[in-house]
């Protein structure tokens, strides 16, 4: 009986740990993330969408190029990008465009001079 109780508890914990990933999204919000936006905007353009449900299946409503539009979803790795305390003296080309361009757990993050692969912030 004790073994069955422990197995049931283990199964509930395993399922429960997945709930935030499934239920953490708003209704109609698709999985995946938005590609980074290169901002700043020089024009004011009307949004093409307000929420993911207005986009085709494989697309997500994201702020990109000065307005919200349906764009291909990108996979997003766990963790957040660390804050960059530096100031850019010489902008460089982006070394990545999305998290999947980076190896392992590294994320594609905005830095002072462009985007590059960084370890996620702790905490």
UniProtKB/Swiss-Prot annotation:
Q: Record's Gene Ontology CC terms?
A: extracellular space
Please report the stretch or stretches of sequence annotated as the WAP domain.
27-73, 74-121
Query: What SUPFAM superfamilies does the record tag this protein with?
Result: Elafin-like
Intrachain S-S bonds: 34-62, 41-66, 49-61, 55-70, 81-109, 88-113, 96-108, 102-117
**Entry-linked PROSITE patterns:** WAP
User: Where does this protein reside within or beyond the cell?
Assistant: Secreted
Q: Which UniProt keywords apply?
A: Disulfide bond, Protease inhibitor, Repeat, Secreted, Serine protease inhibitor, Signal
InterPro entries in UniProt? Elafin-like_sf (IPR036645), WAP_dom (IPR008197), WAP_four-disulfide_core (IPR050514)
Position of the signal peptide: 1-24
Q: Name one GO molecular function term.
A: serine-type endopeptidase inhibitor activity
**A GO biological-process term:** antibacterial humoral response
What does this gene product do? Answer: Putative acid-stable proteinase inhibitor.
Q: What is this protein called?
A: WAP four-disulfide core domain protein 5
Q: What is the lineage of its organism?
A: Eukaryota, Metazoa, Chordata, Craniata, Vertebrata
Q: Which gene encodes it?
A: WFDC5
